């Protein structure tokens, strides 16, 4: 491993020990805000510190085994130990390189999840409902909280569009690669000839930003309309104009919220989603400029990107970005998404490592 990387790891390991000592200090405990910030930093440094300690121990094992090679009686055993230690050292070095990759500051944040029916009419709306259920099951398994912000139901079930806030540890980091196009191939319940239809939905995942980081929105740039909350088929949920529709005139972004009975609460929710959407649009524009010289393997997360195909007759799900096909569709639709999410994250890390190697 390069001396510069070892020096960086030593500094991080020392900082980990320093933060650990600070967390036991009475003054730190008395200052709750500082205590929370240091607790987060300690958690972030723990993996790299532990891995570096293991790597240092393996280097000592390699040194000991090399010294034993000079002893004829110990040579055979030393050769075995040396081979094992070198293999372990390589594995730990790979882990350390991944742990040192630049972190997305949004990864630990809560996220807004939007699922929108695309081409395919009623069948697309039904699939949007299936996708939202899939993500809800995944969130439940990870003990995340799901709060519906806005929902427009399909005439025969499912959703034309649904927006939810998902709260918990590392939500955005796990779900951010879900953004893009999701295609379904199956025989609709209304299809008498047994023909397979293709429908599509789009998914957008955006980090929830703290108030201090929300983009500045000029109230003069907003058109705010009120209307009555309605359920499927136009049934009125209540008789007051509590639902809110906010249009951001410069970008044309529209957000509706009708989940709460209070107009004030709906407006607050809609503004938080609007801020996240504007931020996401600005980020996409910046990433597009950065990627103009080099195409990201994982796609842009744009709605037009085709992420996955869910083929029900074959029980198959295919992630087109990394050419991964699994015949475990039933499990995926029940929320067992790690088998799809982990390979995407690993591909992203490999992409980052390759980019760093090019820079070096």
Curated annotation (Swiss-Prot):
> Which is one Pfam family of this protein?
PCRF
> What's the main place this protein lives?
cytoplasm
InterPro entries, sorted: PCRF (IPR005139), Pep_chain_release_fac_I (IPR000352), Pep_chain_release_fac_I_sf (IPR045853), Prokaryotic/Mito_RF (IPR050057), RF-1 (IPR004373)
Subcellular locations according to the entry: Cytoplasm
Post-translational modifications reported in the UniProt record: Methylated by PrmC. Methylation increases the termination efficiency of RF1.
Instruction: Work out whether the entry's keyword set contains Protein biosynthesis.
Output: yes
Q: Which GO terms describe its cellular component?
A: cytoplasm
Which residue stretches belong to region Disordered?
284-313
Entry keyword set: Cytoplasm, Methylation, Protein biosynthesis
> Where in this protein does the record say N5-methylglutamine is found?
235
* Molecular-function GO term, any one: translation release factor activity, codon specific
According to its UniProt entry, the function of this protein is described as:
Peptide chain release factor 1 directs the termination of translation in response to the peptide chain termination codons UAG and UAA.
Family that this chain belongs to: Belongs to the prokaryotic/mitochondrial release factor family.
Listed HAMAP family: Rel_fac_1 (MF_00093)
- Protein known as: Peptide chain release factor 1
- This protein's species is Escherichia coli O127:H6 (strain E2348/69 / EPEC)
